[in-house]
């Protein structure tokens, strides 16, 4: 086995199979495992996906939320063992791959047009 095959085998073991389809503009709820002392708990983090970077086991999403009037962004490794769950709450209709322009917007200007799926 050469080096590339070994790396591919290691990455294949770390990739989670039960993830939902996540797109830029989705409103998601990420369950993050937090360790406080010797206790562990799941902390939910809700927000809009403003960026997604695909790179096999190193895929990341950037989630932005408003907390007490201040924008907070956090980058999550999708396949990290610290991520317990990712739930897509709603979808939005966007025309950009990265929604960095939301950083300058304030209040109602940060709203995105909601996308409804046909049943």
Swiss-Prot record:
<dbReference type="InterPro" id="IPR038657">
    <property type="entry name" value="Ribosomal_bL19_sf"/>
</dbReference>
<dbReference type="GO" id="GO:0005840">
    <property type="term" value="C:ribosome"/>
</dbReference>
<dbReference type="GO" id="GO:1990904">
    <property type="term" value="C:ribonucleoprotein complex"/>
</dbReference>
<keyword id="KW-0687">Ribonucleoprotein</keyword>
<dbReference type="InterPro" id="IPR001857">
    <property type="entry name" value="Ribosomal_bL19"/>
</dbReference>
<protein>
    <recommendedName>
        <fullName>Large ribosomal subunit protein bL19c</fullName>
    </recommendedName>
</protein>
<dbReference type="Pfam" id="PF01245">
    <property type="entry name" value="Ribosomal_L19"/>
</dbReference>
<comment type="similarity">
    <text>Belongs to the bacterial ribosomal protein bL19 family.</text>
</comment>
<dbReference type="GO" id="GO:0003735">
    <property type="term" value="F:structural constituent of ribosome"/>
</dbReference>
<keyword id="KW-0150">Chloroplast</keyword>
<dbReference type="GO" id="GO:0009507">
    <property type="term" value="C:chloroplast"/>
</dbReference>
<dbReference type="InterPro" id="IPR008991">
    <property type="entry name" value="Translation_prot_SH3-like_sf"/>
</dbReference>
<dbReference type="GO" id="GO:0006412">
    <property type="term" value="P:translation"/>
</dbReference>
<keyword id="KW-0934">Plastid</keyword>
<dbReference type="InterPro" id="IPR018257">
    <property type="entry name" value="Ribosomal_bL19_CS"/>
</dbReference>
<keyword id="KW-0689">Ribosomal protein</keyword>
């Amino acid at each position: 086995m050469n080096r590339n095959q070994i790396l591919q085998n290691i990455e294949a073991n770390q990739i989670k199979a039960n993830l939902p389809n996540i797109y830029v503009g989705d409103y998601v709820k990420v369950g993050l495992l937090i360790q406080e002392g010797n206790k562990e708990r799941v902390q939910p983090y809700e927000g809009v996906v403003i960026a997604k970077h695909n790179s096999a086991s190193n895929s990341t999403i950037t989630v932005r939320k408003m907390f007490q009037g201040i924008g907070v962004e956090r980058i999550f490794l999708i396949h990290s063992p610290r991520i317990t769950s990712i739930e897509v709450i709603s979808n939005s209709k966007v025309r950009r791959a990265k929604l960095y322009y939301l950083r300058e917007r304030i209040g109602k200007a940060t709203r995105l047009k909601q996308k409804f799926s046909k049943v």
